[in-house]
């Protein structure tokens, strides 16, 4: 099955790709191709998903929610990365919102003072658009119309990234998180979705599906490993970070991220505490307590299926212990040990 879906990718990515500065991304472009995407997706294997009316579709060795797969195919076909672009790559619920805030604050620190930074009034997701969500479904958001924007994000597995991303030479940062906490964060997050597709499966059933790789963009461990291997082959193009180590001591990692992005902090900035200011501005505690991220407030640029507050639950390391039994924890730990054995991944970031 995997070879068939990878062949499908090859078939749909032969289009001549324009620069995303020049791409006509009106909603009609996605809409006129959407039926073709849906017809293609209807031929792929599917399984029961975490909601009764939302199946998971197999494509390229990974599992997808139908709408996100449509967006992925559209990005593969039409998104054209430039060498100057920078992508925040991740699996869902692994620190994406935090990393988006950091990359935006680092890249734009000379444009705003402490009181005028847009992060104080708007959600970080508004400034670093997803190439498989915002680009196809919401092409009119202001950040996509800004030709000077170079920050983008994606949950797309490395093997299925648009060819232009891989070939352009643009840089990427990938963040991963301990799988047990990732699962709990995802399961609780899905309960906050505004949807008519039915309730989320109970904890035990959802956990079993997660362990079997049946989750959006899953299997999660494969997702991590693919980016890890790409990082090992291209350390000058990919920065590989772990959520837990960054949370424990963010300053050195933020400095490394800035240097990697080409926006390194000067000695004068370090003396003035600019690094600390960026870390504090983007901290979980700061962002969660901003008015823009409270209650049922939505992002300003487009409709959202989640309120802004949904992206800020606890941000704690080890919260899984409040939900999972020792047997469940042992199961996922065993899967991780088996998958990552001999790769050097478990030792990275310790």
Curated annotation (Swiss-Prot):
UniProt xrefs under Pfam families: Sulfotransfer_1
Result after altering residue 339 to N: In strain: cv. C24
Active site annotation, chain numbering: 155 (proton acceptor)
Assigned EC number: 2.8.2.38
Regulation affecting activity: Inhibited by phosphoadenosine 5'-phosphate (PAP).
SUPFAM superfamilies the UniProt entry points to: P-loop containing nucleoside triphosphate hydrolases
Keywords: Acetylation, Cytoplasm, Transferase
UniProt name for this protein: Cytosolic sulfotransferase 18
Lineage: Eukaryota, Viridiplantae, Streptophyta, Embryophyta, Tracheophyta
């Amino acid at each position: 099955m995997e070879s068939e879906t990878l062949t499908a990718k090859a078939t749909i990515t032969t289009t001549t790709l324009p620069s995303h500065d020049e791409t006509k991304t009106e909603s009609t472009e996605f809409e006129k191709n959407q039926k073709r995407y849906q017809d293609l997706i209807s031929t792929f294997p599917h399984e029961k998903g975490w909601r009764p009316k939302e199946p998971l579709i197999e494509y390229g060795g990974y599992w997808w929610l139908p709408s996100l797969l449509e967006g992925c195919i559209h990005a593969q076909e039409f998104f054209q990365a430039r060498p100057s672009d920078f992508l925040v790559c991740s699996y869902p619920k692994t620190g994406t919102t935090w990393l988006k805030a950091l990359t935006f604050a680092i890249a734009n620190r000379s444009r705003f003072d402490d009181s005028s930074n847009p992060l104080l009034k708007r959600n970080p997701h508004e400034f670093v658009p997803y190439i498989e969500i915002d680009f196809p479904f919401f092409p009119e958001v202001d950040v996509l119309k800004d030709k000077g924007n170079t920050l983008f994000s994606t949950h797309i597995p490395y093997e299925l990234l648009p060819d232009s991303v891989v070939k352009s030479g643009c840089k990427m940062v990938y963040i991963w998180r301990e799988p047990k906490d990732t699962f709990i964060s995802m399961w609780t997050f899905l309960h906050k979705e505004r949807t008519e597709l039915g309730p989320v499966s109970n904890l035990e059933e959802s956990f079993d599906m997660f362990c079997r790789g049946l989750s959006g963009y899953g299997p999660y461990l494969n997702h991590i490993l693919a980016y890890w291997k790409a990082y090992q082959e291209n350390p000058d193009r990919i920065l590989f970070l772990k959520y837990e180590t960054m949370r424990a001591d963010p300053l050195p990692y933020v400095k490394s991220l800035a240097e990697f992005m080409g926006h390194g902090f000067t000695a004068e900035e370090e003396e003035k505490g600019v690094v600390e200011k960026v870390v504090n501005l983007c901290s979980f505690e700061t962002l969660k307590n901003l008015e823009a991220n409270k209650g049922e407030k939505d992002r300003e640029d487009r409709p959202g299926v989640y309120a802004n507050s949904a992206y800020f639950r606890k941000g704690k390391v080890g919260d899984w212990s409040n939900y999972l039994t020792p047997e469940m924890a042992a199961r996922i730990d065993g899967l991780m040990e088996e998958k990552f054995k001999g790769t050097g991944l478990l030792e990275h970031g310790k």
